[in-house]
Amino acid sequence: MARVKGGTVTRKRRKKVLKLAKGYYGSKHTLFKSAKEQVMNSYYYAFRDRRQKKRDFRKLWIARINAAARMNGLSYSKLMHGLKLAEIDINRKMLADLAVNDAAAFTALAEQAKDALSK
């Protein structure tokens, strides 16, 4: 049986990894072994952080809503409960946007939440 030389396949595989490692610091973009390890870690970080991003944004929105709610004399949890009782269905992303960009509209929502809580 003849010997199979895998030069082209190996070269293509290595070039593919080194192309993915373009822009990495130090030997991580030139040496195949360290580039391969870094690319694998990069995929791991990307996968993990796509999920982390959702948590981070939710935390940011809640912090913004809480700050604006306290300026209107409510805590975050009281505001959310009041909005639910008033049957105002608005998500946290939109509430946070209102809190930052349209304080008057947020204040109106906070007043409706207060009214619903007092009933």
From Swiss-Prot:
GO MF entry, a single one: rRNA binding
GO biological process, one term: translation
Gene3D superfamilies recorded: 6.10.160.10, Ribosomal protein L20 (1.10.1900.20)
UniProt keyword terms in alphabetical order: Ribonucleoprotein, Ribosomal protein, RNA-binding, rRNA-binding
One GO cellular component term: ribosome
InterPro entries cross-referenced by the UniProt entry: Ribosomal_bL20, RIBOSOMAL_L20_CS, Ribosomal_protein_bL20_C
Entries under HAMAP family matching the protein: Ribosomal_bL20 (MF_00382)
Function field: Binds directly to 23S ribosomal RNA and is necessary for the in vitro assembly process of the 50S ribosomal subunit. It is not involved in the protein synthesizing functions of that subunit.
Family per similarity comment: Belongs to the bacterial ribosomal protein bL20 family.
NCBIfam families tied to this protein: rplT_bact
Name by which UniProt lists this protein: Large ribosomal subunit protein bL20
Organism encoding this protein: Enterococcus faecalis (strain ATCC 700802 / V583)
Gene name tied to this protein: rplT
